[in-house]
């Protein structure tokens, strides 16, 4: 068989581990040929690819980013390019395409699958917001990076008697904020799923100083927002791909809390450091398993599906189910965190 692989959307620790796994399973165990499209869907639409053999994937298991490159393609461009993509699949003699990506990539994969292209998806996102899989690779690395940063920030916050508002990634879901906040022993966490009351947040932070503590750490997912009418808040806008472009929750909260508490408050934005660098052992293993099972699904002809972790097993689930909704932080999980913050 001849299999095409691509990585699309934001980069993520573990992408190279998937690519490596696909090549090893397909080439060594099945005698397949694998090609990689450069820069995601753009590479498929422009027929820009390279051959992936064992030499090409040597030494990439622990490397962050993606050796294939990635890009974002506006949805309308992909819709208009379905026939071009089909033509390139036929021209290259591909039996399957394995796209590796998050919500946007999986929606694009479903579009192509619905139009008859042989697609087997692999989910990736540091946000951990794909509903049909227990975990996505990249999440563990992002939480580890954020937790290490929070551990370090505690000492400088205490030295200067400051409130630090640490902004982590999470447009629509607060999984990184929740897990890193719990792991680092933060003093408050705000997430997109639960609009916060600025009065309650101020009181919670203020209680620490009233009790004689010298600092406070607030972890804020980038998509967190206050309850309507409780504080002046700039919600930002949208980029050309339709994604929300936020105006900075950490910056806005630092101004508000400093005015209310009379304590110096500083924003800290972790940003893309959460997406870069070496994946954790957990993410390497999960990504490798996803790649292995994606190749097996191709050989079984299970198209229109993607890999998913269910318990300790890797299962195949439909792309339609995968993109139906996001996996958000439930109230019960937030309540668990609240009792220890």
Swiss-Prot record:
<feature type="binding site">
    <location>
        <begin position="72"/>
        <end position="73"/>
    </location>
    <ligand>
        <name>ATP</name>
    </ligand>
</feature>
<feature type="binding site">
    <location>
        <position position="103"/>
    </location>
    <ligand>
        <name>Mg(2+)</name>
    </ligand>
</feature>
<dbReference type="GO" id="GO:0061621">
    <property type="term" value="P:canonical glycolysis"/>
</dbReference>
<feature type="binding site" description="in other chain">
    <location>
        <begin position="272"/>
        <end position="275"/>
    </location>
    <ligand>
        <name>substrate</name>
    </ligand>
</feature>
<dbReference type="InterPro" id="IPR015912">
    <property type="entry name" value="Phosphofructokinase_CS"/>
</dbReference>
<dbReference type="GO" id="GO:0005524">
    <property type="term" value="F:ATP binding"/>
</dbReference>
<dbReference type="GO" id="GO:0047334">
    <property type="term" value="F:diphosphate-fructose-6-phosphate 1-phosphotransferase activity"/>
</dbReference>
<comment type="pathway">
    <text>Carbohydrate degradation; glycolysis; D-glyceraldehyde 3-phosphate and glycerone phosphate from D-glucose: step 3/4.</text>
</comment>
<feature type="binding site">
    <location>
        <begin position="102"/>
        <end position="105"/>
    </location>
    <ligand>
        <name>ATP</name>
    </ligand>
</feature>
<comment type="function">
    <text>Catalyzes the phosphorylation of D-fructose 6-phosphate to fructose 1,6-bisphosphate by ATP, the first committing step of glycolysis.</text>
</comment>
<keyword id="KW-0479">Metal-binding</keyword>
<dbReference type="GO" id="GO:0046872">
    <property type="term" value="F:metal ion binding"/>
</dbReference>
<feature type="active site" description="Proton acceptor">
    <location>
        <position position="127"/>
    </location>
</feature>
<keyword id="KW-0460">Magnesium</keyword>
<keyword id="KW-0418">Kinase</keyword>
<keyword id="KW-0067">ATP-binding</keyword>
<keyword id="KW-0324">Glycolysis</keyword>
<dbReference type="GO" id="GO:0070095">
    <property type="term" value="F:fructose-6-phosphate binding"/>
</dbReference>
<dbReference type="InterPro" id="IPR035966">
    <property type="entry name" value="PKF_sf"/>
</dbReference>
<dbReference type="InterPro" id="IPR012003">
    <property type="entry name" value="ATP_PFK_prok-type"/>
</dbReference>
<dbReference type="InterPro" id="IPR000023">
    <property type="entry name" value="Phosphofructokinase_dom"/>
</dbReference>
<dbReference type="Pfam" id="PF00365">
    <property type="entry name" value="PFK"/>
</dbReference>
<dbReference type="GO" id="GO:0003872">
    <property type="term" value="F:6-phosphofructokinase activity"/>
</dbReference>
<keyword id="KW-0547">Nucleotide-binding</keyword>
<dbReference type="GO" id="GO:0006002">
    <property type="term" value="P:fructose 6-phosphate metabolic process"/>
</dbReference>
<comment type="subunit">
    <text>Homodimer or homotetramer.</text>
</comment>
<dbReference type="InterPro" id="IPR012829">
    <property type="entry name" value="Phosphofructokinase_III"/>
</dbReference>
<feature type="binding site" description="in other chain">
    <location>
        <begin position="169"/>
        <end position="171"/>
    </location>
    <ligand>
        <name>substrate</name>
    </ligand>
</feature>
<dbReference type="GO" id="GO:0030388">
    <property type="term" value="P:fructose 1,6-bisphosphate metabolic process"/>
</dbReference>
<feature type="binding site">
    <location>
        <position position="10"/>
    </location>
    <ligand>
        <name>ATP</name>
    </ligand>
</feature>
<keyword id="KW-0963">Cytoplasm</keyword>
<dbReference type="InterPro" id="IPR022953">
    <property type="entry name" value="ATP_PFK"/>
</dbReference>
<feature type="binding site">
    <location>
        <position position="266"/>
    </location>
    <ligand>
        <name>substrate</name>
    </ligand>
</feature>
<feature type="binding site" description="in other chain">
    <location>
        <begin position="125"/>
        <end position="127"/>
    </location>
    <ligand>
        <name>substrate</name>
    </ligand>
</feature>
<dbReference type="GO" id="GO:0005945">
    <property type="term" value="C:6-phosphofructokinase complex"/>
</dbReference>
<feature type="binding site">
    <location>
        <position position="162"/>
    </location>
    <ligand>
        <name>substrate</name>
    </ligand>
</feature>
<feature type="binding site" description="in other chain">
    <location>
        <position position="222"/>
    </location>
    <ligand>
        <name>substrate</name>
    </ligand>
</feature>
<protein>
    <recommendedName>
        <fullName>ATP-dependent 6-phosphofructokinase 3</fullName>
        <ecNumber>2.7.1.11</ecNumber>
    </recommendedName>
</protein>
<keyword id="KW-0808">Transferase</keyword>
<feature type="site" description="Important for substrate specificity; cannot use PPi as phosphoryl donor">
    <location>
        <position position="104"/>
    </location>
</feature>
<comment type="similarity">
    <text>Belongs to the phosphofructokinase type A (PFKA) family. Mixed-substrate PFK group III subfamily.</text>
</comment>
């Amino acid at each position: 068989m001849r299999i095409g692989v691509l990585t699309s959307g934001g980069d993520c620790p573990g992408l190279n581990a998937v690519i490596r796994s696909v090549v090893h399973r397909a080439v060594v165990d099945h005698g397949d040929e694998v090609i990689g499209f450069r820069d995601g869907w753009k590479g498929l639409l422009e027929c820009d690819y390279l051959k992936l053999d064992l030499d090409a994937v040597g030494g990439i298991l622990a490397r962050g980013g993606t050796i294939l490159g990635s890009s974002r393609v506006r949805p309308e461009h992909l819709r208009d390019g379905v026939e071009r993509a089909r033509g390139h699949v036929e021209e290259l003699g591909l039996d399957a395409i394995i796209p590796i990506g998050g919500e946007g990539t999986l929606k694009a994969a479903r579009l192509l699958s619905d139009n008859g292209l042989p697609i087997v998806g692999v989910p990736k996102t540091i946000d951990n917001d794909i509903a049909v899989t227990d975990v996505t690779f990249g999440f563990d690395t992002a939480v580890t990076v954020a937790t290490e940063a929070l551990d370090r920030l505690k000492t400088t916050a205490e030295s200067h008697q400051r409130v630090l508002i640490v902004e982590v990634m999470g447009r629509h879901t607060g999984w990184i904020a929740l897990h890193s906040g719990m792991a680092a022993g933060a003093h408050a966490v705000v997430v997109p799923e639960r609009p916060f009351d600025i009065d309650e947040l101020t009181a919670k932070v203020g209680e620490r100083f009233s009790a004689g503590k010298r600092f406070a750490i607030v972890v804020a997912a980038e998509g967190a927002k206050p309850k309507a009418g409780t504080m002046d808040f700039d919600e930002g806008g949208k980029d050309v791909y339709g994604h929300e472009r936020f105006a900075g929750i950490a910056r806005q909260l630092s101004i508000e809390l400093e005015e209310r508490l009379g304590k110096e408050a500083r924003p800290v934005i972790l940003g893309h450091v959460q997406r870069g660098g070496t994946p954790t052992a957990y993410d390497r293993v999960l990504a490798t398993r996803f790649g292995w099972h994606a190749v097996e699904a191709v050989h079984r002809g299970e198209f229109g599906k993607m890999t998913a972790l269910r318990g300790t097993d890797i299962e195949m689930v439909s792309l339609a189910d995968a993109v139906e909704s996001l996996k958000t932080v439930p109230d019960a999980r937030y309540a668990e965190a609240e009792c220890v913050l």
